[in-house]
Curated annotation (Swiss-Prot):
Propeptide residues per the UniProt entry: 1-242, 401-410
Cellular localisation: Cytoplasm
Location of the active site: 345, 386
SMART domains the UniProt entry points to: CASc (SM00115)
Protein name stated in the entry: Caspase-8
Subunit (UniProt): Heterotetramer that consists of two anti-parallel arranged heterodimers, each one formed by a 15 kDa (caspase-8 subunit p15) and a 10 kDa (caspase-8 subunit p10) subunit. Interacts (via N-terminus) with Diap2; likely to bind Diap2 simultaneously with Fadd to form a trimeric complex. Interacts with Dark (via N-terminus).
Pfam families for the chain: Dredd_2nd (PF23724), Dredd_N (PF23725), Peptidase_C14 (PF00656)
Organismal lineage: Eukaryota, Metazoa, Ecdysozoa, Arthropoda, Hexapoda
PANTHER family (UniProt xref): CASPASE 10, DED DOMAIN-CONTAINING PROTEIN
Gene3D superfamilies, A to Z: 3.40.50.1460
Organs and tissues of expression: Constitutively expressed in fat bodies of larvae and adults.
Effect caused by changing residue 436 to R: In L23; blocks expression of DptA following bacterial infection
Name of the gene: Dredd
Family: Belongs to the peptidase C14A family.
Organism for this UniProt entry: Drosophila melanogaster (Fruit fly)
Length: 494
């Protein structure tokens, strides 16, 4: 189908065909298509936003969105529709309409962002951004931008919370004029909130996508320079206002979305396990850990004061530990961080559950890193447990292994593990006043969290603990390892 024939074939599409076009698309495709078709006009965007929200509340959403669009733009709807279908990659629909995908691809260039024939170029780039962001990244963007929009404007907030449909939130911000497309050449556009968030969260490619779209569509050289300067000013302004950015290499967690602080507090131990699990048991009964409740209460006090949702559990068996960690990870999509404390007995690279089953610490770390909900978010695993080297007869026959895998080194980014002691040694705990490590950690957060980032706080803890001496000259040195990419600050305390 040559270019001229393609245009002739466009005119053969009938409005009655649109009923079947909608039936062939899933809801996600409808959202993307309607965003591209309706988003460039304020009243149209307002209309389609309400229609899409109504569809999200229906189990069997039926609609005539495309027929409405065709009637509103009788002269141009076919060209807009086919280009938008190309952009969202709706090949099945286009084949049913009689088009050849390769010819459409050469004509409309859907794979090249910022270049369009009929659809607004910024809408195409915004759609591309939505497709490129992970679910977690979309969740962080909507949380950040929605907070800023609501702080600047009156009116009812959008009562929709699914980041899988980020285009719905973009339509809301367009109708509120918090972001602006400008004219067909993107003159008068304003994507300050989006570009600033993308840059401050390491999403430079997506930030450049929006900036380049504005610059490349400016009709005159002077206009291009003006657009570039406007984008630069928007980025600088947004970085100054960003709730999570204190400097280029710093992340400041917020009280409102600090996250979950999960405490597994093991005081009493038993050996009532199935025959299959006996190989994971400690060779000898484990002693009661007096003083651990002091640590638990102190952690609850300190982390609650920073806005964390503290969840503390006593005497949890191995499967209970896994279930509680998984639950916390599942609920961390729109939270800034996750902190997990395990207070127990242990030995080198292992920690005990309350049923005396030994668990591999690196498996627990991998479990935290395996969740998309925590991708590029601070994850803290803090363990108070001995890490002594044991002779073979003092070890379990096997360590219980968690069924978890990570497939990329990137999943381990922003992970911090803080151990009460270096490998090979005991972790000291007073039966009345609690452990040296947890006590020093809470003291350091009390004194320094307003001015020091987490890594520096733990350096202070290591220094203070290493100076302590027990009644028999015992000593201890904590061990911290981290893949944080920037300085991370705890939320402000009350």
């Amino acid at each position: 189908m040559a270019g001229s024939n393609l245009l002739i074939h466009l005119d053969t599409i009938d409005q009655n065909d649109l009923i079947y076009v909608e039936r062939d698309m899933n809801f996600a495709q409808k959202v993307g298509l309607c965003f591209l078709l309706y988003g460039d006009d304020h009243s149209d965007a307002t209309y389609i936003l309400q229609k899409l929200l109504a569809m999200t509340r229906s189990d069997f959403p039926q609609s005539d969105l495309l027929i409405k669009f065709a009637k509103s733009r009788p002269e141009t709807w076919r060209r807009h529709l086919v280009e938008a279908l190309c952009i969202i990659g709706a090949r099945k629909v286009l084949r049913r309409l009689g088009f050849c995908w390769q010819e459409l691809r050469m004509h409309y260039l859907p794979h090249i962002a910022g270049i369009t024939l009929h659809v607004h170029p910024l809408l195409k780039s915004l759609y591309r951004m939505c497709e490129e962001l992970s679910l977690v990244q979309s969740g962080r963007l909507l949380l950040d931008v929605r907070e800023k929009v609501e702080s600047q404007q009156a009116g009812d907030p959008l009562r929709f919370y699914d980041p899988a449909y980020l285009e719905i939130f973009l339509l809301d911000w367009l109708t509120r004029r918090s972001i602006k497309l400008g004219d067909i050449n993107a003159a008068g556009s304003d994507v300050q909130l989006l570009v600033g968030h993308l840059k401050s969260n390491g999403l430079q490619a997506q930030a450049n996508l929006l900036k380049d779209t504005i610059i490349s569509n400016a009709p005159e050289p002077d206009a291009a320079g003006t657009a570039a300067m406007a984008v630069k000013q928007e980025i600088e302004s947004d970085n100054q206002q960003s709730y999570c950015s204190t400097q280029i290499d710093a992340l400041k967690l917020t009280r409102e979305n600090a996250g979950i602080a999960l405490i597994i507090n093991q005081q009493k131990f038993h050996r009532n396990v199935s025959r299959d699990n006996m190989k994971f048991l400690s060779p000898d009964p484990l002693r009661r850990r007096d003083g651990t409740d002091v640590d638990k209460e102190r952690l609850i006090e300190v982390f609650s004061s920073m806005g964390y949702n503290v969840e503390a559990y006593d005497n949890v068996d191995h499967m209970g530990i896994i279930e509680r960690i998984r639950s916390a990870c599942d609920r961390s999509l729109v939270r800034d961080s996750l902190v997990v404390f395990i207070l127990s007995h242990g030995f080198e690279e292992a920690v005990y559950a309350s049923n005396s089953i030994a668990m591999k610490i690196t498996d627990i770390e991998d479990l935290l890193c395996s969740y998309d909900t925590l991708y590029y978010k601070p994850k803290l695993l803090i363990i108070q447990a001995c890490q002594e080297k044991l002779v073979h007869k003092k070890k379990p026959n096997e360590l219980f292994r968690i069924d978890v895998t990570t497939v990329s080194p990137d999943q381990h980014i922003d992970m911090l593990r803080a151990m009460s002691t270096v490998n090979g040694y005991a972790a000291l705990r007073h039966t009345q006043t609690g452990s040296w490590f947890i006590g020093s950690l809470c003291d350091a957060i009390d004194r320094r969290s307003a001015s020091e980032h987490i890594a520096d706080i733990l350096t202070i803890v290591t220094n203070e603990v290493s100076k302590k001496r027990g009644s028999n000259d015992e000593s201890m040195v904590p061990n911290v390892k981290s893949t944080f990419r920037q300085h991370v600050y705890f939320p402000p305390r009350l």
